[in-house]
Every structure is written in C-alpha cells, then in structure tokens.
Amino acid sequence: MTDKKLYISDVTLRDGSHAIRHQYSVPQVRAIARALDAAGVDSIEVAHGDGLAGSSFNYGFGAHTDVEWIAAVAESVQRAAVATLLLPGIGTVHDLREAYAAGARVVRVATHCTEADTARQHIETARSMGMNVAGFLMMSHMIPPDRLAGQAKLMESYGAHCVYVVDSGGALTMDGVRARFRAFKDVLDPKTETGMHAHHNLSLGVANSIVAVEEGCDRIDASLAGMGAGAGNAPLEVFIAAAERMGWHHGCDLYQLMDAADDIVRPLQDRPVRVDRETLALGYAGVYSSFLRHAESAAGKYGLKTVDILVELGRRRMVGGQEDMIVDVALDLQRSGGAKSREAA
C-alpha cells in the first residue's frame, strides 16, 4: 500500500436496499446522501437493489423508481459522484440514459463472473456518454482466480475504467481475495483500476477489503452500518476506522460516518443486518446474498427452515437472477421432508 488516496464507494442506497426490500423513501435517500457527502465519500451508489429496472415481481417492487432515487441523491450532494448499477438482462441502455439524465455519472455494469461478454454494449455505451465505468464480476468466489482475471480482461477491453472482485455470497476468505487481485494484476493494464465489493456473511467483509488494498486495490465498496444484502457489506465506518489505524489516505470523516450509521441507517432495518444463523449460511454455502429475504419468505410459506433452503441453493450452485428457483427448491424440500444435505457447496 502506497500513499495513494483510496476511492471510497458507498453502496448504502443500492445494496442496502435489499435489507429493507427496496422501500427507501425519497426523504430517507436525501438524508443518507447528505450525510455521506458531508463525510467525504467519493461516490454514492443508488438504485433498486438489483440495479436499474430491478423493480419487478421477481426481485421485489421498489417504493420509488430508480430515476426518482437518483435525482434525490443528485439534488442532495455537493461533491460526491452519483453512481448506479446496471445488470445486463435487467437494465437496458435506455435505462442507463435515463439514469444519466437524472444525475448518475458513474455506472457499475454487473454480470455473473463467467458472463462478462454480456456487458459489452452497456460498457461501451456508458463510455460514449462520458460516464466513469466499472465492471462488476458477481459471485467471484465461484471460479478460479485465473478465469476471473480473464473475465476482467474482457471488461477492460470493452472500456471499463475499473474492474471489481465482487464477493456476492460473502464466501471468499482472505487468501481467495489475495489470489484474485494478484491474478488481475498479472493480466490487466496498470492504468485499469481494481475494486473490492465485500459481503460480511463470514464476518470477513472488512478483512477482505483490507487484503484487497494490500494487493493494490483502488476502490472499496462499503455501506453505513453494513446496510446490504445478507449480513450486509463491509461496514463503512468500521473499514474507515481500520484504514485510519493503518495510516491509509481515505478522505472520510470517521465520526460523521459513525453518527450516520447509528442515527440514520440502523433504525431503518426491519431485520437486523448482522451475521446470524441465516446470513452465515449464505457465506458458508456460497449463496447470492440477496436471496436471503426471498428464502425467508419461502421458508415461512412452506414450513421450512431458511438455512435448509439456502444450503440447497448453494448445493445447486444457483446464481443471481435465479430468484424464481427459491420457491422450486422450497417445494422440493417440502416434498422430501426437509433438508437434503447441510454440506457446503
């Protein structure tokens, strides 16, 4: 780690949306954005939890449109860049243009870790619009580091300024993070930045982010009070405190972040964002973190244990976008009388 300035990317208003079933009100969005802007983060990501156009029967309907949320952030900040997320196959280039018109200037184009080729049109279009573009390789734990690096190289070739290791399942350990960033370094142009998006399902969100920085990572995703899918993301205030202890240049006011986490964000959680039996199962089984609330609903409806549904989803290697399979798995378990196996995938 050099004296370079870390790019701090807050995801409270996008990934954090999963934790409250995409029900942020516009006043809540404004309050969180103002607090983050005052605390010095570099960008604030905002959208439905599943990205632009994610509001749907499959993923859950949002309280507002993406454009309304993006405009609320853009109107509330003085210095932070407004970011958003797009998953090809859910969001379209049309949605991207609407987001830009509402104030978004950074976009993260997210694909499953083996499907970077689906991002080409969206990355190229975003670049042509003058946006800062990051490639986002979700479920990065599911393939070896060299294959992940090959996918990162594709995103770079389409024009991504930055490519992320995205631990959507919160299943990576520190060694796994280190190996992936070293593989990225072997193939990416030195001018291409790298980023880390951690989840806290094994309580390793901050540790994994620290390892990423030690391996040269430029951008760190985090959220206030860890607000995010599953056990949440790396808690922003905790990561900044650790970075401060390590003497890293982050540009954020720790005390303002601590206040925002406890006074604004934590009271919004209708289900505590924490490591517990269910969220630990996500990390243990390597399951997409946003499956949590859907699996809990299915467990309640069909008289099952959420953990059993999650572990079976991991055994079947289900990935983001296959939320409809949660009910299928629940019905299979109900017919078979419960858990098939609690061995991790």
UniProtKB/Swiss-Prot annotation:
Feature type site, description Transition state stabilizer: 14
Q: Name one GO biological process term.
A: catabolic process
Give the superkingdom in one word. Answer: Bacteria
Q: Which residues bind substrate?
A: 14-15, 168, 197, 288
Q: Which residues form the Pyruvate carboxyltransferase domain?
A: 6-258
- InterPro entries, A to Z: 2-IPM_HCS-like, 4OH_2_O-val_aldolase, Aldolase_TIM, DmpG_comm, DRE_TIM_HOA, PYR_CT
- In the UniProt record, does the keyword Manganese occur? yes
Protein EC = 4.1.3.39
Under Gene Ontology molecular function, one entry of this record is: manganese ion binding
Disulfide pairs?
none
Q: Which residues form the active site?
A: 18 (proton acceptor)
UniProt keyword annotation of Manganese present: yes
Give the catalysed reaction(s), semicolon-separated: (S)-4-hydroxy-2-oxopentanoate = acetaldehyde + pyruvate
Task: List ligand-binding residues for Mn(2+).
Answer: 15, 197, 199
* Database matches in SUPFAM superfamilies: Aldolase, post-HMGL domain-like
Which keywords annotate this record? Answer: Aromatic hydrocarbons catabolism, Lyase, Manganese, Metal-binding, Plasmid
The family classification in the record reads: Belongs to the 4-hydroxy-2-oxovalerate aldolase family.
Q: Which NCBIfam families match?
A: 4OH_2_O_val_ald, PRK08195.1
PANTHER family for this protein: 2-ISOPROPYLMALATE SYNTHASE 1, CHLOROPLASTIC-RELATED, HOMOCITRATE SYNTHASE-RELATED
Listed name of the protein: 4-hydroxy-2-oxovalerate aldolase 2
